[in-house]
UniProtKB/Swiss-Prot annotation:
<keyword id="KW-0349">Heme</keyword>
<feature type="transmembrane region" description="Helical">
    <location>
        <begin position="179"/>
        <end position="199"/>
    </location>
</feature>
<keyword id="KW-0408">Iron</keyword>
<feature type="transmembrane region" description="Helical">
    <location>
        <begin position="348"/>
        <end position="368"/>
    </location>
</feature>
<dbReference type="InterPro" id="IPR030689">
    <property type="entry name" value="Cytochrome_b"/>
</dbReference>
<feature type="transmembrane region" description="Helical">
    <location>
        <begin position="321"/>
        <end position="341"/>
    </location>
</feature>
<feature type="binding site" description="axial binding residue">
    <location>
        <position position="84"/>
    </location>
    <ligand>
        <name>heme b b562</name>
    </ligand>
</feature>
<dbReference type="InterPro" id="IPR027387">
    <property type="entry name" value="Cytb/b6-like_sf"/>
</dbReference>
<dbReference type="InterPro" id="IPR005797">
    <property type="entry name" value="Cyt_b/b6_N"/>
</dbReference>
<dbReference type="InterPro" id="IPR048260">
    <property type="entry name" value="Cytochrome_b_C_euk/bac"/>
</dbReference>
<keyword id="KW-0999">Mitochondrion inner membrane</keyword>
<dbReference type="GO" id="GO:0008121">
    <property type="term" value="F:ubiquinol-cytochrome-c reductase activity"/>
</dbReference>
<comment type="function">
    <text>Component of the ubiquinol-cytochrome c reductase complex (complex III or cytochrome b-c1 complex) that is part of the mitochondrial respiratory chain. The b-c1 complex mediates electron transfer from ubiquinol to cytochrome c. Contributes to the generation of a proton gradient across the mitochondrial membrane that is then used for ATP synthesis.</text>
</comment>
<keyword id="KW-0249">Electron transport</keyword>
<comment type="subunit">
    <text>The cytochrome bc1 complex contains 11 subunits: 3 respiratory subunits (MT-CYB, CYC1 and UQCRFS1), 2 core proteins (UQCRC1 and UQCRC2) and 6 low-molecular weight proteins (UQCRH/QCR6, UQCRB/QCR7, UQCRQ/QCR8, UQCR10/QCR9, UQCR11/QCR10 and a cleavage product of UQCRFS1). This cytochrome bc1 complex then forms a dimer.</text>
</comment>
<comment type="similarity">
    <text>Belongs to the cytochrome b family.</text>
</comment>
<feature type="transmembrane region" description="Helical">
    <location>
        <begin position="114"/>
        <end position="134"/>
    </location>
</feature>
Length: 380
């Protein structure tokens, strides 16, 4: 009998075992589509980013003009830039939904996969931050100044660390050059980490909406989930391309149409929408170091999710108390996002503080309590 090349070729069999013959639970819902959508986002961002890097100049006197030239004079440069800028937004929409799915269905109990995933989120946030600085508009410059300045809150070494990061005594040409280098490098780090993420996932296999072992009922990935992924691609690409073509600046900041000027500060310095929840948590604490620690904790708390799981059931499908808390957490994050976009004044200060407290209270205190109560209710 002839050898099946797909199953025996050293390279093809890796692809086969990951995308064709992979045993997959028969009941995973559309919430499991976001992994492949994130892969699509990453590929889109790397391709458009590479095309942009061919025309971009990482120099303070030329960066803004080079981006402007790209949009005016390069064939479809405006489209490539709009796809890249809005692609970041869709990347974050997908990753937040992906993480939300993981929390709801208890996927964090695959500890290695989850931990690599949190590292991926941190790397993505770093990539988006340094990328936002590159057009060298007002919000790019002041965003970079404010966020890098947070490192100065670290006791003893803070100030030295910030100056080392800047390559001088303020955000200037050396900062822009190194941020471009980081922005070019990190997506490939993300691609590498993604492979590690998938390697760990394929050790245990996917979770499913019921949170029960599915070894007795698996189906091949292709054609069932490959076609489902293609539908997901279409459903994401339609709003993505619509946004990039019809309203490309909807999610951007108008301040960034003004070239960076160290002598005038914008009235409201705020990051892109996908960082606003963390920015609100940062601002809700009056102390600088305290704010920085809260900011770090808002993401790093995800590492604790597997340790805080006390329920006998993996998924929240049959856990009404945890479900109420989960959706309260989602609403709380929306409130934080809104508060982060508002000026620091009454009533936004107190709303931000209450929402920040609620965020940590739900994850660290209320989720475990709900789990214990639900375990007791199982015995009734």
């Amino acid at each position: 009998m002839a050898l099946n090349l797909r199953k025996n070729h050293p390279l093809l069999k890796i692809i086969n075992n990951s995308l064709v013959d992979l045993p997959t639970p028969s009941n995973i819902s559309a919430w499991w589509n976001f992994g492949s959508l994130l892969g699509l986002c990453l590929i889109t961002q790397i391709v458009t980013g590479l095309l942009l890097a061919m025309h971009y100049t990482a120099d303070t006197s030329l960066a803004f003009t080079s981006v402007s030239h790209m949009c005016r004079d390069v064939q479809f440069g405006w489209l490539i830039r709009n796809l890249h800028a809005n692609g970041a937004s869709f990347f974050f929409i997908c990753i937040y939904l992906h993480i939300g799915r993981g929390i709801y269905y208890g996927s964090y109990l695959n500890k290695e996969t989850w931990n690599i995933g949190v590292i991926l989120l941190l790397t993505l946030m770093a990539t988006a931050f340094v990328g936002y600085v590159l057009p060298w508009g007002q919000m790019s410059f002041w965003g970079a100044t404010v966020i890098t300045n947070l490192f100065s809150a670290i006791p003893y070494i803070g100030q030295t660390l910030v100056e080392w990061l800047w390559g001088g005594f303020s955000v200037d040409n050396p900062t822009l050059t190194r941020f471009f280098a980081f922005h070019f490098l990190l997506p490939f780090v993300i691609a590498g980490l993604t492979l590690v993420h998938l390697t760990f996932l394929h050790e245990t296999g996917s979770n499913n909406p019921l949170g029960i072992p599915s070894d007795c009922d698996k189906i091949p990935f292709h054609p069932y989930y490959s076609i489902k992924d293609l539908l997901g691609f279409a459903l994401m690409l339609i709003p993505f391309i619509t946004l990039a073509l019809f309203s490309p600046n909807l999610l951007g900041d108008p301040e960034n149409f003004t070239p960076a000027n160290p002598l005038t500060t914008p009235p409201h310095i705020k990051p892109e929408w996908y960082f606003l929840f963390a920015y609100a948590i940062l601002r809700s604490i009056p102390n600088k170091l305290g704010g920085v620690l809260a900011l770090a904790a808002s993401i790093l708390v995800l590492f604790l999710m597997p340790l805080l799981h006390v329920s006998k059931q993996r998924s929240m499908t049959f856990r009404p108390l945890s479900q109420i808390l989960f959706w309260t957490l989602v609403a709380d994050l929306c409130i934080l996002t809104w508060v982060g976009s508002q000026p620091v004044e009454h009533p936004f200060i107190i709303i931000g503080q209450l929402a920040s407290f609620t965020y940590f209270a739900i994850i660290l205190i209320l989720f475990p309590i709900a789990g214990v109560l639900e375990n007791k209710m199982l015995k009734l």
